[in-house]
Amino acid sequence: MKLQGKVAAITGATAGIGRGIAEAFLAEGASVALMARNATKAEAVLAELGVGNRAVFIAGDATVQADVEGFVDKAAAQFGKLDILVNNAGGATGLQPLVDLSDQSFDEAMKWNVYATFWACRRALKTMLAAQSGRIINISSVEGKHGKPVLTAYSAAKHAVNGLTKALAREVGTQGVTVNAICPGLVITDIIRNNGPDTAKAMGMSFDEMVDMFAQESAIKRPNTVEEIAAVAVLLASPEGGGITGATISVDGGSAQY
């Protein structure tokens, strides 16, 4: 098992990519602390995972600094150390043309995607630098490499996450800590199913038309899967990933080429 005995803290971990990464880490022998806002859903996920005390839920809102920092502290305290941080919480907000985008919507995109990542990284580094060992994996987006109409705030936020990733990797590279970002393309998760219709409407098309448009932008002409994202996260967290840092890895079926 590639992650035997390792401890991971994962934000936004009860569904979609976050849950997929949690499942993959558990399968490789890690223990995981999961942060999410919905306690009822989180407890149901823990029961479904069925791994006993190797997985714990810690309530928190990624847009609240005290919650994010408290989550990192509690995860380390629960398991006695912290080896891996996965910043998965985030998402698209402010789905309007820029001329209609409010300051509040832009701020929300930054807080959910950028500040949540910043707060968690800063807190986790206190433990990781003391141990001279750690892996930070930020879940960004293909929109952190290019942009799309009405996704201006989200694209700006994910560009910021990628910039933070690259700079921090150089800052801590000689201290045993790697920092990377995974940039997924289209992945059909619950949040996409729930929020996608509004995005599609803002773009002047149906949800199915939007999904097909995004899929056709890729070389493989289909959405990526959660499992494909999780496999890259396992590599970055594993001993084999020790030489990878400062990378913004596209798992997008080739859409970042276009």
Residue ranges of predicted features:
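Active-site helix of classical SDR
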Residues: 121, 157, 165
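Residue(s) in the substrate-gating loop at a strand-loop-helix junction
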Residues: 141
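Substrate-binding pocket helix/loop in short-chain dehydrogenase/reductase
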Residues: 96-98, 102-110, 136, 214
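Conserved glycine-rich Rossmann-like NAD(P)H-binding loop of the short-chain dehydrogenase/reductase
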Residues: 28-44
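C-terminal substrate-recognition "lid" of short-chain dehydrogenase/reductases
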Residues: 2, 79, 118, 133, ...
